[in-house]
Protein backbone atom coordinates (compact mmCIF):
# COMPACT_ATOMS: atom_id res chain seq x y z
CA UNK A 1 0.00 0.00 0.00
CA UNK A 2 1.34 3.40 -0.87
CA UNK A 3 0.55 6.70 0.68
CA UNK A 4 0.16 9.70 -1.62
CA UNK A 5 1.30 12.99 -0.22
CA UNK A 6 0.91 16.23 -2.16
CA UNK A 7 4.15 18.12 -2.36
CA UNK A 8 4.01 21.54 -0.76
CA UNK A 9 4.37 23.27 -4.10
CA UNK A 10 1.27 21.40 -5.36
CA UNK A 11 -0.85 21.89 -2.24
CA UNK A 12 -0.25 25.61 -1.99
CA UNK A 13 -2.14 26.55 -5.21
CA UNK A 14 -5.03 24.31 -4.16
CA UNK A 15 -5.26 26.02 -0.81
CA UNK A 16 -5.19 29.41 -2.52
CA UNK A 17 -7.99 28.32 -4.86
CA UNK A 18 -10.05 27.02 -1.94
CA UNK A 19 -9.57 30.26 -0.03
CA UNK A 20 -10.47 32.27 -3.11
CA UNK A 21 -13.61 30.20 -3.61
CA UNK A 22 -14.66 30.79 -0.02
CA UNK A 23 -14.40 34.52 -0.66
CA UNK A 24 -15.66 34.73 -4.24
CA UNK A 25 -18.71 32.46 -4.04
CA UNK A 26 -20.41 34.43 -1.23
CA UNK A 27 -19.69 37.65 -3.14
CA UNK A 28 -21.15 36.21 -6.34
CA UNK A 29 -24.21 34.93 -4.46
CA UNK A 30 -24.61 38.31 -2.80
CA UNK A 31 -24.45 40.05 -6.19
CA UNK A 32 -26.88 37.57 -7.73
CA UNK A 33 -29.35 38.01 -4.86
CA UNK A 34 -29.09 41.79 -5.14
CA UNK A 35 -29.69 41.83 -8.90
CA UNK A 36 -32.52 39.30 -8.66
CA UNK A 37 -34.40 40.96 -5.82
CA UNK A 38 -34.06 44.50 -7.15
CA UNK A 39 -34.47 43.90 -10.89
CA UNK A 40 -35.51 40.34 -11.82
CA UNK A 41 -38.01 39.33 -9.13
CA UNK A 42 -41.64 39.02 -10.32
CA UNK A 43 -42.51 41.74 -7.79
CA UNK A 44 -39.53 44.02 -8.50
CA UNK A 45 -41.78 46.65 -10.11
CA UNK A 46 -43.90 47.19 -6.99
CA UNK A 47 -43.28 50.41 -5.04
CA UNK A 48 -41.47 50.44 -1.71
CA UNK A 49 -38.07 51.13 -0.19
CA UNK A 50 -35.23 49.46 -2.09
CA UNK A 51 -33.59 48.41 1.15
CA UNK A 52 -36.72 46.45 2.14
CA UNK A 53 -36.82 44.81 -1.29
CA UNK A 54 -33.15 43.90 -1.05
CA UNK A 55 -32.88 42.36 2.42
CA UNK A 56 -34.89 40.98 5.34
CA UNK A 57 -32.55 42.84 7.68
CA UNK A 58 -34.70 45.91 7.02
CA UNK A 59 -37.69 44.22 8.67
CA UNK A 60 -35.44 42.73 11.34
CA UNK A 61 -34.41 46.22 12.39
CA UNK A 62 -38.00 47.31 13.02
CA UNK A 63 -39.07 43.91 14.41
CA UNK A 64 -36.27 43.40 16.90
CA UNK A 65 -33.77 46.25 17.24
CA UNK A 66 -36.19 49.20 17.22
CA UNK A 67 -38.80 47.33 19.30
CA UNK A 68 -41.54 45.37 17.50
CA UNK A 69 -42.93 48.23 15.44
CA UNK A 70 -42.78 47.16 11.80
CA UNK A 71 -46.58 47.27 11.75
CA UNK A 72 -46.43 51.03 12.32
CA UNK A 73 -43.55 51.48 9.89
CA UNK A 74 -45.67 49.80 7.22
CA UNK A 75 -48.37 52.39 7.84
CA UNK A 76 -45.81 55.15 7.26
CA UNK A 77 -44.61 53.42 4.09
CA UNK A 78 -48.14 53.48 2.70
CA UNK A 79 -48.32 57.22 3.26
CA UNK A 80 -45.11 57.56 1.28
CA UNK A 81 -45.62 55.00 -1.50
CA UNK A 82 -49.39 54.54 -1.78
CA UNK A 83 -51.86 51.71 -1.10
CA UNK A 84 -49.65 48.87 -2.37
CA UNK A 85 -46.10 48.43 -1.05
CA UNK A 86 -43.38 45.79 -1.23
CA UNK A 87 -42.32 45.47 2.39
CA UNK A 88 -39.64 42.77 2.13
CA UNK A 89 -37.99 40.74 -0.65
CA UNK A 90 -41.01 38.47 -1.10
CA UNK A 91 -44.11 40.17 0.31
CA UNK A 92 -46.66 42.73 -0.84
CA UNK A 93 -48.74 44.69 1.68
CA UNK A 94 -51.97 46.45 0.72
CA UNK A 95 -53.83 49.18 2.60
CA UNK A 96 -57.25 49.28 0.97
CA UNK A 97 -60.31 48.09 2.93
CA UNK A 98 -62.19 47.31 -0.28
CA UNK A 99 -59.55 44.77 -1.32
CA UNK A 100 -59.69 42.83 1.95
CA UNK A 101 -62.27 40.28 0.84
CA UNK A 102 -60.23 39.56 -2.28
CA UNK A 103 -57.15 38.51 -0.34
CA UNK A 104 -59.06 36.82 2.49
CA UNK A 105 -61.51 34.99 0.26
CA UNK A 106 -63.90 32.19 1.14
CA UNK A 107 -62.95 28.53 1.12
CA UNK A 108 -63.94 28.22 -2.55
CA UNK A 109 -60.76 30.09 -3.55
CA UNK A 110 -57.44 28.59 -2.48
CA UNK A 111 -55.48 30.52 0.09
CA UNK A 112 -52.28 29.12 1.58
CA UNK A 113 -50.14 30.45 4.41
CA UNK A 114 -46.49 31.47 4.38
CA UNK A 115 -44.11 29.36 6.44
CA UNK A 116 -41.72 32.28 6.96
CA UNK A 117 -44.33 33.75 9.30
CA UNK A 118 -46.09 30.72 10.76
CA UNK A 119 -42.86 29.00 11.86
CA UNK A 120 -42.24 31.72 14.43
CA UNK A 121 -45.11 30.46 16.62
CA UNK A 122 -43.83 26.91 17.08
CA UNK A 123 -47.26 25.40 16.32
CA UNK A 124 -46.75 24.31 12.72
CA UNK A 125 -49.40 21.57 12.88
CA UNK A 126 -52.19 23.72 14.32
CA UNK A 127 -54.85 25.42 12.22
CA UNK A 128 -52.94 28.70 12.15
CA UNK A 129 -49.74 26.88 11.20
CA UNK A 130 -51.25 24.67 8.49
CA UNK A 131 -49.85 25.96 5.20
CA UNK A 132 -51.89 24.17 2.52
CA UNK A 133 -55.47 25.21 1.73
CA UNK A 134 -56.88 21.69 1.42
CA UNK A 135 -55.31 20.32 4.59
CA UNK A 136 -56.47 23.39 6.50
CA UNK A 137 -60.03 22.90 5.28
CA UNK A 138 -60.07 19.29 6.54
CA UNK A 139 -58.71 20.22 9.96
CA UNK A 140 -61.00 23.22 10.30
CA UNK A 141 -64.06 21.15 9.39
CA UNK A 142 -63.40 18.93 12.42
CA UNK A 143 -63.43 21.93 14.78
CA UNK A 144 -66.06 24.15 13.18
CA UNK A 145 -69.17 22.44 14.64
CA UNK A 146 -68.03 23.30 18.17
CA UNK A 147 -67.81 27.00 17.36
CA UNK A 148 -71.04 27.37 15.40
CA UNK A 149 -73.65 29.84 16.66
CA UNK A 150 -75.85 26.97 17.81
CA UNK A 151 -73.04 25.34 19.80
CA UNK A 152 -71.98 28.65 21.32
CA UNK A 153 -75.53 29.48 22.43
CA UNK A 154 -75.61 26.15 24.22
CA UNK A 155 -72.54 27.35 26.15
CA UNK A 156 -74.36 30.31 27.71
CA UNK A 157 -74.70 28.62 31.13
CA UNK A 158 -70.90 28.25 31.20
CA UNK A 159 -70.44 31.95 30.40
CA UNK A 160 -73.13 32.97 32.91
CA UNK A 161 -71.58 30.87 35.66
CA UNK A 162 -68.15 32.42 35.19
CA UNK A 163 -69.60 35.91 34.92
CA UNK A 164 -71.35 35.29 38.23
CA UNK A 165 -67.97 34.44 39.79
CA UNK A 166 -66.48 37.65 38.39
CA UNK A 167 -69.31 39.78 39.79
CA UNK A 168 -68.72 38.09 43.13
CA UNK A 169 -65.08 39.18 42.95
CA UNK A 170 -66.30 42.73 42.29
CA UNK A 171 -68.06 42.64 45.65
CA UNK A 172 -64.83 41.48 47.32
CA UNK A 173 -62.94 44.43 45.86
CA UNK A 174 -65.72 46.79 46.95
CA UNK A 175 -65.25 45.59 50.52
CA UNK A 176 -61.45 45.83 50.46
CA UNK A 177 -61.29 49.12 48.56
CA UNK A 178 -58.32 47.85 46.52
CA UNK A 179 -58.18 48.70 42.80
CA UNK A 180 -59.39 45.88 40.57
CA UNK A 181 -57.17 45.16 37.55
CA UNK A 182 -59.78 44.59 34.87
CA UNK A 183 -57.36 43.48 32.16
CA UNK A 184 -56.30 40.58 34.41
CA UNK A 185 -59.89 39.86 35.49
CA UNK A 186 -61.17 39.71 31.91
CA UNK A 187 -58.27 37.46 30.86
CA UNK A 188 -59.15 35.13 33.75
CA UNK A 189 -62.80 35.13 32.68
CA UNK A 190 -62.16 34.27 29.04
CA UNK A 191 -59.46 31.76 29.93
CA UNK A 192 -61.65 29.87 32.39
CA UNK A 193 -64.44 29.70 29.81
CA UNK A 194 -62.37 28.49 26.86
CA UNK A 195 -60.33 26.00 28.92
CA UNK A 196 -63.49 24.49 30.36
CA UNK A 197 -64.97 24.13 26.88
CA UNK A 198 -61.75 22.80 25.36
CA UNK A 199 -60.59 20.41 28.07
CA UNK A 200 -63.52 19.92 30.43
CA UNK A 201 -61.82 21.79 33.26
CA UNK A 202 -60.18 25.16 33.87
CA UNK A 203 -57.44 26.55 36.08
CA UNK A 204 -60.06 28.61 38.00
CA UNK A 205 -58.11 31.81 37.45
CA UNK A 206 -61.16 33.91 38.32
CA UNK A 207 -60.89 32.69 41.89
CA UNK A 208 -57.17 33.42 42.25
CA UNK A 209 -56.40 36.46 44.39
CA UNK A 210 -54.63 38.23 41.50
CA UNK A 211 -56.68 36.52 38.74
CA UNK A 212 -53.52 34.54 37.86
CA UNK A 213 -52.41 36.36 34.69
CA UNK A 214 -49.60 33.84 34.07
CA UNK A 215 -51.14 32.31 30.94
CA UNK A 216 -51.89 35.68 29.37
CA UNK A 217 -48.43 37.00 30.22
CA UNK A 218 -46.72 33.92 28.81
CA UNK A 219 -48.56 34.32 25.50
CA UNK A 220 -47.56 37.97 25.31
CA UNK A 221 -43.95 37.04 26.00
CA UNK A 222 -44.15 34.39 23.30
CA UNK A 223 -45.38 37.04 20.87
CA UNK A 224 -42.32 39.15 21.58
CA UNK A 225 -39.99 36.20 21.05
CA UNK A 226 -41.79 35.33 17.82
CA UNK A 227 -40.20 38.23 15.96
CA UNK A 228 -36.72 36.87 16.65
CA UNK A 229 -37.74 33.30 15.78
CA UNK A 230 -39.23 34.48 12.49
CA UNK A 231 -35.79 35.62 11.36
CA UNK A 232 -33.86 32.79 13.04
CA UNK A 233 -36.16 29.73 12.96
CA UNK A 234 -33.36 27.35 13.95
CA UNK A 235 -33.44 28.95 17.40
CA UNK A 236 -36.80 27.29 18.08
CA UNK A 237 -35.39 23.77 17.72
CA UNK A 238 -32.35 24.66 19.78
CA UNK A 239 -34.33 26.25 22.60
CA UNK A 240 -36.78 23.35 22.77
CA UNK A 241 -33.94 21.02 23.69
CA UNK A 242 -33.10 23.05 26.78
CA UNK A 243 -34.74 22.38 30.17
CA UNK A 244 -37.25 25.04 31.20
CA UNK A 245 -35.13 26.10 34.17
CA UNK A 246 -32.20 26.97 31.90
CA UNK A 247 -34.47 28.49 29.27
CA UNK A 248 -36.01 30.83 31.83
CA UNK A 249 -32.55 32.14 32.68
CA UNK A 250 -31.47 32.58 29.05
CA UNK A 251 -34.76 34.03 27.82
CA UNK A 252 -37.60 34.69 30.29
CA UNK A 253 -39.95 35.25 27.35
CA UNK A 254 -39.22 31.89 25.73
CA UNK A 255 -39.08 30.16 29.12
CA UNK A 256 -42.57 31.30 30.05
CA UNK A 257 -43.86 30.37 26.61
CA UNK A 258 -42.24 26.93 26.80
CA UNK A 259 -43.78 26.29 30.22
CA UNK A 260 -47.17 27.23 28.80
CA UNK A 261 -46.72 24.69 26.01
CA UNK A 262 -45.72 22.02 28.54
CA UNK A 263 -48.91 22.63 30.51
CA UNK A 264 -51.10 22.37 27.41
CA UNK A 265 -49.33 19.17 26.34
CA UNK A 266 -50.19 17.62 29.69
CA UNK A 267 -53.85 18.64 29.37
CA UNK A 268 -54.12 17.06 25.93
CA UNK A 269 -52.18 13.95 26.97
CA UNK A 270 -54.52 13.44 29.95
CA UNK A 271 -57.58 13.77 27.70
CA UNK A 272 -56.13 11.31 25.17
CA UNK A 273 -55.37 8.77 27.89
CA UNK A 274 -58.83 9.12 29.42
CA UNK A 275 -60.39 8.72 25.98
CA UNK A 276 -58.44 5.53 25.28
CA UNK A 277 -59.55 4.11 28.63
CA UNK A 278 -63.14 5.37 28.18
CA UNK A 279 -62.69 7.12 31.53
CA UNK A 280 -64.37 10.45 30.86
CA UNK A 281 -67.77 12.05 31.27
CA UNK A 282 -69.59 11.31 28.00
CA UNK A 283 -72.42 13.68 28.92
CA UNK A 284 -70.12 16.72 28.69
CA UNK A 285 -69.37 18.02 25.20
CA UNK A 286 -65.82 19.35 25.11
CA UNK A 287 -63.79 20.21 22.04
CA UNK A 288 -60.91 17.80 22.39
CA UNK A 289 -62.96 14.82 23.55
CA UNK A 290 -65.07 15.28 20.42
CA UNK A 291 -62.04 15.65 18.13
CA UNK A 292 -60.81 12.26 19.32
CA UNK A 293 -64.16 10.82 18.21
CA UNK A 294 -63.95 12.50 14.79
CA UNK A 295 -62.96 11.04 11.42
CA UNK A 296 -59.64 12.88 11.30
CA UNK A 297 -56.53 10.82 10.55
CA UNK A 298 -54.69 9.14 13.39
CA UNK A 299 -51.89 11.68 13.07
CA UNK A 300 -54.30 14.61 13.24
CA UNK A 301 -55.67 13.11 16.46
CA UNK A 302 -52.23 12.44 17.94
CA UNK A 303 -51.05 14.23 21.06
CA UNK A 304 -48.07 15.60 19.11
CA UNK A 305 -50.46 17.62 16.95
CA UNK A 306 -53.40 18.23 19.25
CA UNK A 307 -51.39 20.05 21.92
CA UNK A 308 -50.60 22.66 19.27
CA UNK A 309 -54.29 23.00 18.47
CA UNK A 310 -55.01 23.25 22.17
CA UNK A 311 -52.54 26.07 22.66
CA UNK A 312 -54.00 28.05 19.78
CA UNK A 313 -57.62 27.53 20.84
CA UNK A 314 -56.95 28.62 24.42
CA UNK A 315 -54.64 31.51 23.53
CA UNK A 316 -56.95 32.93 20.89
CA UNK A 317 -59.95 32.42 23.15
CA UNK A 318 -58.28 34.24 26.02
CA UNK A 319 -56.33 37.26 24.86
CA UNK A 320 -58.27 38.87 22.03
CA UNK A 321 -61.68 38.70 23.69
CA UNK A 322 -60.33 39.92 27.02
CA UNK A 323 -58.69 42.90 25.35
CA UNK A 324 -61.89 43.81 23.48
CA UNK A 325 -63.79 43.65 26.78
CA UNK A 326 -61.24 45.96 28.37
CA UNK A 327 -61.36 48.51 25.57
CA UNK A 328 -65.18 48.54 25.57
CA UNK A 329 -65.36 48.87 29.35
CA UNK A 330 -62.88 51.73 29.50
CA UNK A 331 -64.66 53.88 26.94
CA UNK A 332 -68.12 53.19 28.39
CA UNK A 333 -66.92 54.24 31.84
CA UNK A 334 -65.03 57.25 30.48
CA UNK A 335 -67.96 58.57 28.44
CA UNK A 336 -71.13 59.32 30.48
CA UNK A 337 -73.26 59.81 27.35
CA UNK A 338 -72.41 56.32 26.11
CA UNK A 339 -72.99 54.72 29.52
CA UNK A 340 -76.34 56.47 29.95
CA UNK A 341 -77.61 55.37 26.55
CA UNK A 342 -76.36 51.82 27.07
CA UNK A 343 -77.98 51.49 30.50
CA UNK A 344 -81.30 52.82 29.19
CA UNK A 345 -81.28 50.19 26.45
CA UNK A 346 -80.32 47.40 28.85
CA UNK A 347 -82.97 48.35 31.42
CA UNK A 348 -85.66 48.27 28.73
CA UNK A 349 -84.51 44.90 27.38
CA UNK A 350 -83.80 43.31 30.79
CA UNK A 351 -86.54 44.43 33.21
CA UNK A 352 -85.36 42.04 35.93
CA UNK A 353 -81.55 41.82 36.20
CA UNK A 354 -81.81 38.82 38.51
CA UNK A 355 -83.15 36.68 35.66
CA UNK A 356 -80.85 34.86 33.19
CA UNK A 357 -79.85 36.91 30.16
CA UNK A 358 -80.91 35.90 26.66
CA UNK A 359 -78.10 36.04 24.12
CA UNK A 360 -80.66 36.21 21.31
CA UNK A 361 -82.23 39.30 22.87
CA UNK A 362 -78.87 40.96 23.49
CA UNK A 363 -77.71 40.44 19.90
CA UNK A 364 -80.71 42.46 18.70
CA UNK A 365 -79.94 45.52 20.83
CA UNK A 366 -78.55 48.16 18.45
CA UNK A 367 -76.58 50.30 20.88
CA UNK A 368 -75.10 47.35 22.78
CA UNK A 369 -74.10 45.96 19.40
CA UNK A 370 -72.44 49.28 18.60
CA UNK A 371 -70.49 49.16 21.87
CA UNK A 372 -69.37 45.60 21.13
CA UNK A 373 -68.34 46.44 17.56
CA UNK A 374 -66.41 49.55 18.57
CA UNK A 375 -64.61 47.56 21.24
CA UNK A 376 -63.64 44.95 18.67
CA UNK A 377 -62.58 47.62 16.15
CA UNK A 378 -60.36 49.56 18.53
CA UNK A 379 -58.86 46.46 20.14
CA UNK A 380 -57.84 45.10 16.70
CA UNK A 381 -57.51 41.49 18.02
CA UNK A 382 -54.27 40.93 16.07
CA UNK A 383 -51.67 43.69 15.84
CA UNK A 384 -49.56 41.84 13.27
CA UNK A 385 -50.36 41.64 9.59
CA UNK A 386 -52.18 38.53 8.33
CA UNK A 387 -50.64 36.65 5.41
CA UNK A 388 -52.16 34.77 2.53
CA UNK A 389 -50.74 33.20 -0.63
CA UNK A 390 -52.88 32.68 -3.73
CA UNK A 391 -51.18 29.58 -5.21
CA UNK A 392 -52.96 29.45 -8.55
CA UNK A 393 -54.53 32.87 -9.04
CA UNK A 394 -53.22 36.19 -10.33
CA UNK A 395 -54.82 38.93 -8.27
CA UNK A 396 -55.36 42.30 -9.89
CA UNK A 397 -55.28 45.45 -7.78
CA UNK A 398 -56.23 48.81 -9.31
CA UNK A 399 -55.22 52.13 -7.78
CA UNK A 400 -54.46 55.61 -9.09
CA UNK A 401 -55.33 54.64 -12.67
CA UNK A 402 -52.80 51.82 -12.59
CA UNK A 403 -53.28 48.07 -12.62
CA UNK A 404 -51.04 45.91 -10.47
CA UNK A 405 -50.93 42.19 -11.33
CA UNK A 406 -49.80 40.14 -8.34
CA UNK A 407 -48.22 36.83 -9.45
CA UNK A 408 -49.47 33.52 -8.01
CA UNK A 409 -47.42 32.37 -5.04
CA UNK A 410 -46.70 35.90 -3.79
CA UNK A 411 -47.20 36.40 -0.03
CA UNK A 412 -49.81 39.13 0.50
CA UNK A 413 -50.87 40.82 3.71
CA UNK A 414 -53.09 43.46 5.24
CA UNK A 415 -53.26 44.80 8.80
CA UNK A 416 -56.46 45.29 10.79
CA UNK A 417 -55.04 48.37 12.48
CA UNK A 418 -54.76 50.17 9.13
CA UNK A 419 -58.22 49.06 8.00
CA UNK A 420 -59.88 50.11 11.25
CA UNK A 421 -58.26 53.54 11.14
CA UNK A 422 -58.97 54.28 7.49
CA UNK A 423 -60.71 57.64 7.78
CA UNK A 424 -62.63 57.07 4.54
CA UNK A 425 -64.48 54.19 6.19
CA UNK A 426 -64.35 55.19 9.86
CA UNK A 427 -64.32 59.01 10.17
CA UNK A 428 -62.76 60.20 13.44
CA UNK A 429 -61.46 56.64 13.67
CA UNK A 430 -59.65 56.98 16.99
CA UNK A 431 -62.86 57.98 18.79
CA UNK A 432 -65.12 55.36 20.38
CA UNK A 433 -68.47 55.91 18.64
CA UNK A 434 -71.00 53.08 19.05
CA UNK A 435 -73.55 55.08 17.10
CA UNK A 436 -71.57 54.66 13.88
CA UNK A 437 -72.72 51.01 13.82
CA UNK A 438 -76.32 51.94 14.57
CA UNK A 439 -76.42 54.43 11.70
CA UNK A 440 -74.60 52.26 9.14
CA UNK A 441 -74.99 48.49 9.54
CA UNK A 442 -73.05 47.99 6.28
CA UNK A 443 -69.88 48.87 8.19
CA UNK A 444 -69.69 45.22 9.27
CA UNK A 445 -67.85 44.32 6.07
CA UNK A 446 -64.94 46.53 7.17
CA UNK A 447 -64.63 45.04 10.66
CA UNK A 448 -61.70 42.68 10.14
CA UNK A 449 -60.35 42.08 13.64
CA UNK A 450 -61.14 38.37 13.35
CA UNK A 451 -60.11 38.10 9.71
CA UNK A 452 -62.37 37.07 6.84
CA UNK A 453 -62.88 34.14 4.53
CA UNK A 454 -62.05 30.47 4.86
CA UNK A 455 -59.25 31.10 7.36
CA UNK A 456 -61.06 33.62 9.57
CA UNK A 457 -60.88 33.19 13.34
CA UNK A 458 -62.70 30.00 14.26
CA UNK A 459 -63.84 31.32 17.64
CA UNK A 460 -65.58 34.49 16.45
CA UNK A 461 -69.03 33.35 17.64
CA UNK A 462 -67.72 32.48 21.10
CA UNK A 463 -65.92 35.82 21.32
CA UNK A 464 -69.06 37.77 20.46
CA UNK A 465 -71.17 35.76 22.89
CA UNK A 466 -68.75 36.57 25.70
CA UNK A 467 -68.70 40.25 24.73
CA UNK A 468 -72.50 40.59 24.66
CA UNK A 469 -73.14 38.62 27.84
CA UNK A 470 -70.32 40.15 29.88
CA UNK A 471 -70.96 43.78 28.97
CA UNK A 472 -74.71 43.39 29.43
CA UNK A 473 -74.37 41.67 32.81
CA UNK A 474 -71.86 44.26 34.03
CA UNK A 475 -73.53 47.48 32.94
CA UNK A 476 -77.06 46.34 33.78
CA UNK A 477 -76.14 46.52 37.47
CA UNK A 478 -73.11 48.83 37.63
CA UNK A 479 -72.88 52.51 36.78
CA UNK A 480 -70.67 55.43 37.73
CA UNK A 481 -71.05 58.40 40.06
CA UNK A 482 -72.47 60.38 37.12
CA UNK A 483 -74.70 57.69 35.61
CA UNK A 484 -76.71 55.24 37.71
CA UNK A 485 -79.71 52.99 37.11
CA UNK A 486 -82.56 52.13 39.42
CA UNK A 487 -81.41 48.52 39.89
CA UNK A 488 -77.69 49.19 40.24
CA UNK A 489 -75.80 47.36 42.96
CA UNK A 490 -72.73 49.58 42.76
CA UNK A 491 -70.55 51.97 40.81
CA UNK A 492 -67.20 51.70 39.05
CA UNK A 493 -64.55 54.40 38.84
CA UNK A 494 -61.50 54.35 36.61
CA UNK A 495 -58.36 54.33 38.74
CA UNK A 496 -55.20 55.94 37.36
CA UNK A 497 -56.13 54.76 33.88
CA UNK A 498 -56.37 56.88 30.74
CA UNK A 499 -56.89 56.25 27.03
CA UNK A 500 -53.08 56.21 26.68
CA UNK A 501 -53.08 52.87 28.52
CA UNK A 502 -55.03 51.33 25.65
CA UNK A 503 -52.80 52.53 22.81
CA UNK A 504 -50.92 49.73 21.05
CA UNK A 505 -47.31 50.90 20.98
CA UNK A 506 -45.59 47.70 19.83
CA UNK A 507 -46.46 44.74 17.64
CA UNK A 508 -46.31 41.57 19.71
CA UNK A 509 -48.74 39.77 17.36
CA UNK A 510 -51.58 40.29 19.84
CA UNK A 511 -52.41 43.69 21.37
CA UNK A 512 -50.50 44.62 24.50
CA UNK A 513 -50.64 47.63 26.80
CA UNK A 514 -47.66 50.03 26.90
CA UNK A 515 -44.82 48.77 29.10
CA UNK A 516 -45.18 51.67 31.54
CA UNK A 517 -48.92 51.06 31.99
CA UNK A 518 -50.17 49.74 35.32
CA UNK A 519 -53.16 48.16 33.62
CA UNK A 520 -56.86 48.88 33.22
CA UNK A 521 -57.87 49.49 36.82
CA UNK A 522 -61.12 50.45 38.52
CA UNK A 523 -62.34 50.87 42.05
CA UNK A 524 -65.63 49.23 42.98
CA UNK A 525 -68.15 50.96 45.26
CA UNK A 526 -71.33 49.43 46.69
UniProtKB/Swiss-Prot annotation:
CDD domains: CYP58-like. Keywords: Heme, Iron, Membrane, Metal-binding, Monooxygenase, Oxidoreductase, Transmembrane, Transmembrane helix. Fusaproliferin shows cytotoxicity against pancreatic cancer cell lines and provides a new chemical scaffold that can be further developed to obtain more potent synthetic agents against pancreatic cancer. Fusaproliferin and its analogs show also anti-inflammatory activity and can be hit compounds for the treatment of inflammation-associated diseases. It is a multi-pass membrane protein. Pathway: Secondary metabolite biosynthesis; terpenoid biosynthesis. GO terms for molecular function: heme binding; iron ion binding; monooxygenase activity; oxidoreductase activity, acting on paired donors, with incorporation or reduction of molecular oxygen. It holds the Pfam family p450. It is found in: Membrane. Heme binds at residue 457. It comes from the Eukaryota. Disruption phenotype: Leads to complete loss of terpestacin and fusaproliferin production and accumulates preterpestacin IIa, IIb and IIc. It is an enzyme of class 1 (oxidoreductase). Its main location: membrane. GO terms for cellular component: membrane. The keyword Nucleus does not apply. Its cofactor is heme. The chain crosses the membrane at residues 13-33, 312-332. Its EC number is 1.-.-.-. PROSITE patterns: CYTOCHROME_P450. The keyword Cell inner membrane does not apply. Cytochrome P450 monooxygenase; part of the gene cluster that mediates the biosynthesis of the mycotoxin fusaproliferin (FUP) that belongs to the class of bicyclic sesterterpenoids. The FUP biosynthetic pathway starts with the enzyme encoded by FUP1 that combines a C-terminal prenyltransferase domain responsible for the synthesis of geranylgeranyl diphosphate with the N-terminal terpene cyclase domain, to yield preterpestacin I. Belongs to the cytochrome P450 family. This is Cytochrome P450 monooxygenase FUP3. The lineage of its organism: Eukaryota, Fungi, Dikarya, Ascomycota, Pezizomycotina. The gene is FUP3.
Amino acid sequence: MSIFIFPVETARPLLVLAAAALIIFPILYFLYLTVYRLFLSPISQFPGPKLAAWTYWYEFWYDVVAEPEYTFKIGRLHKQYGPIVRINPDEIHIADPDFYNTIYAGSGRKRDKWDWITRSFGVDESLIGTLGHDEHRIRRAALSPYFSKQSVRALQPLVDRNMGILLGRFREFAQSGAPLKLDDAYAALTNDIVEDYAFGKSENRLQAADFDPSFRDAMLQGGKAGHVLKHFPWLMDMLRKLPNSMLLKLSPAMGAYSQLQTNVKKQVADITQAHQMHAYDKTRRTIFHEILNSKLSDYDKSTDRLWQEGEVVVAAGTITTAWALGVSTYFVLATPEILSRLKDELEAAIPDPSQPLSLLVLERLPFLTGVVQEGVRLSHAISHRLHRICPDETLVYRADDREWRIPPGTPLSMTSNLVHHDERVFPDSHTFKPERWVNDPLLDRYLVAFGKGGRACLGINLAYAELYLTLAALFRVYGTEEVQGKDDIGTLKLFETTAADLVITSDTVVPVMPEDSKGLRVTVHQ
